[in-house]
């Protein structure tokens, strides 16, 4: 019943990117689902590094998934976390050119769709059916991704956080249960503030997005990508 959480950590030049942030978010997701983490931070870091080494990953990803474990019976009521050992799975993907994606140079085209996901998007679970459907909706009409819209306001992309820029101000939805607390999002906003750029964390509408000077998305596997079109409206 989707009692599984996951994290994906990028690897560049053989090094894990923002691992500490991913580990912290993993623990938060586990806590929200009343699950225990069977691996310490040091052990998890060591396993990630060993996987990168033995698989000769220079640019790529490490995928981690933790499920509640195998209960004695099929039931909506989950077993006592102190009596059931979680199941941990990790694997790597070799992705040469991860940091130099042609799509990042060209920019992505976005469509908007209704946000029909469950309410706790802040927990990074494997409950990804609707985001997957949204990505396919975009592909079918020649776009690259979809921004989801709730009550007239953009929440996020199918697997990324959404931003617009207006009058030299970066605008993105504030943290809540409505969006994933992106690790790359946190890094981008931190760098922006260090560079004394204006940042406004608030809801923004589709109309604001259509009229934006610029727009972009961020994620752990795609880093930062410019958005050049939303629902057929050219951006920038």
Question: Which residues does each predicted region cover?
Answer:
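Helix-start/capping segments and mature chain N-termini
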Residues: 2-50, 72-236
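Ordered, amphipathic secondary-structure segments that act as subunit-interaction surfaces
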Residues: 54-66
